[in-house]
Amino acid sequence: MKKTLRIFLLLAMTTSVIAACKKADAVLFEDRSTVSKADKSTWTATADSETPEGWENTGFASALLDNDFATYWHTDYSTVIPYPHWVLIDMKTEQNMISVEIANRQATNPNTVGMKRFKLEGSNDGTTFTSLGEFPFAITNAPQGFPVSSATPYRYLKVTALEAQRATTNHTFLAEIDVFTTKK
């Protein structure tokens, strides 16, 4: 019986180690003492679609980088462009990203439209991208953190909204994007 139990425990530990090795590119962290929030003051953002001038709270992709949760990027209200939608952040220098934090457009009651599922990608030339993961996006006003690999530094971060919360919605929007990096 003891031998069977030891074999079972050894097998369980081995399986856990193998599973962990296959997920080494995504590390969840609670203790942020080893990371820092990247300075985004010089970053720029472009998108496949933006709301034209004159609309409330800008609608431009640049609103994602202004540290103001009251402003937001919104796909064009006046033109119906179906999913996917994307925004590309030029971080100007390569960053060893640990986590990407994304905040939804703020509302008294969290907005129930917008993206439901999205992917993150990294690039050093803004053209060829490497997948950093695909994630669900919850309906909440709170910023949401998504772990990514720090093994390869990237200059560009692309967020692509893949699916809407409601099937009849073609628009998406976000308030802020922040990147947490390894401390230097």
Task: Describe the residue ranges of each PLM region.
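Aromatic, loop-rich ligand-recognition surfaces of beta-strand-rich domains
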Residues: 25, 54, 59, 66-131, ...
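Intrinsically disordered, low-complexity regions enriched in Ser/Pro/Gly/Gln/His and often acidic
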Residues: 34-37, 47-49, 64-66, 79, ...
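Internal alpha-helical transmembrane segments of multi-pass membrane proteins, especially GPCRs
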Residues: 6-10
